[in-house]
Structure formats: structure tokens, C-alpha cells
């Protein structure tokens, strides 16, 4: 029992240390350089971009395709495809497909597919498929298929299939199947199956 509590505290601490770096400031993302070509409507009060191709991008809203060699920052909502060599970041909701060499971040909800080399982070709900080399974090609910090389963390509920090399952690409840190399943790309720080598 003491080992289980220590493991939960250690994993919670590790996950807690990584989340604030992405979610400290929810008001507005910092305006940065924009080295890209954009196609947008001339008289659009919302500043929507429909096609974005370049090196570094910092735009207000994307409804369409954004492909950048280094990074892509969308201040508001992203609907469509956001692909970057290093990081794809959306200030609010991301709906569609996000691909980042290192990380994908959605400040609000992520709906669709997130693929990254290291980390996927959704500040609210993650609905769909998340696959990363290191871990996946959903601030509230993770719903769908979540595969992380090290761990998957849902702040509230994990629903669907979670597969991690080390641990799957749900802050409240887990519904579905969780397969963890070392452990699976759900603080309150479990509906489904958990498979691990050490702790469930």
C-alpha cells in the first residue's frame, strides 16, 4: 500500500511539473515572428487564415492547412491540419489533425488526431487519438485512444484505450482498457480492465 501511494505521488509530481509550462497563461499567447505565406479573407474581423506555409508562424485563427518547418502558433482556434517540424500550438481549441516533431499543445480542447515525438497536451478535453513518444496529458477528460511511450495522464476521467510504457493515470475514473508497463492508477472508480506488471 505504501509503495502504491509513493508511486502515485511520484508520477503526480512528475506530471504536475510538466503541465504548468504549457498552461500557465491562458489569456493570450505571446505575439511572435511570422515568417510564412498566408491566404486569408481581405475583410475578416476574426483574422482567419485558410492556408499557411512557412518557417515560423504566429497567426490568430486557422481554418484549413498550416505547414511550417519550425513551429506554428495559432492564437485562437485551429480547424483543419496544423503540421510543424518542432511544435504545433493552439491557444484555444484544436479540431482536426496536429503533427509536431516535439510537441502539440491545445490550450482548450483537442478533437481529432495529435501525433508528436515527445508530448501532446490538451488543457481541457482530448477527444480522439493521441500518440506521442513520451506522454499525453489531458487537463480534464481523455476520450478515445491514447498511446504514450512513457505515460498518459487525464486530470479527471480517462475513457477508451490507454497504452503507456510506464503508467496510465486518471485523476478520478477510468472507463475502458488501460495497459501500463508498470502501473495504472484511477483515484476513484474503475469500469473496465487494467493490465500492468506491478500496480493496478
Which residue stretches match the model-derived regions?
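Bacterial Sec-dependent N-terminal signal peptides
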Residues: 1-26
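Surface-exposed, glycine- and small/polar-enriched segments that build interaction surfaces at terminal
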Residues: 24-200
